[in-house]
């Protein structure tokens, strides 16, 4: 899933750049939205991973 969020960010960057160069504000804004969405997904993925690691650590220490 991390690859998907990185891809979405890269795709957004390309769209934003092309939109900027061609003076296409719709494409530029779409790129900004894709980048923001990709960053948000990456943030959520990282939070889930950290929560899972924390839960696993707590479960591992429970029996001690």
UniProtKB/Swiss-Prot annotation:
SUPFAM superfamilies: Hypothetical protein YjbJ. Residues 1-40 are annotated as: Disordered. InterPro entries: CsbD, UPF0337_stress_rsp, YjbJ_sf. It comes from the Bacteria. Residues 25-40 have a biased composition (Basic and acidic residues). Gene3D superfamilies: YjbJ (1.10.1470.10). It holds the Pfam family CsbD. Belongs to the UPF0337 (CsbD) family. PANTHER family: UPF0337 PROTEIN YJBJ. This is UPF0337 protein SAOUHSC_00845. It comes from Staphylococcus aureus (strain NCTC 8325 / PS 47). The lineage of its organism: Bacteria, Bacillati, Bacillota, Bacilli, Bacillales.
């Amino acid at each position: 899933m991390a690859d998907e969020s990185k891809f979405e960010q890269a795709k957004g960057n390309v769209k934003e750049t092309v939109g900027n160069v061609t003076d296409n504000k719709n494409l530029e804004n779409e790129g900004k939205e894709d980048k923001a969405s990709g960053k948000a997904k990456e943030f959520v993925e990282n939070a889930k991973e950290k929560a899972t690691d924390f839960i696993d650590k707590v479960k591992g220490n429970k029996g001690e």
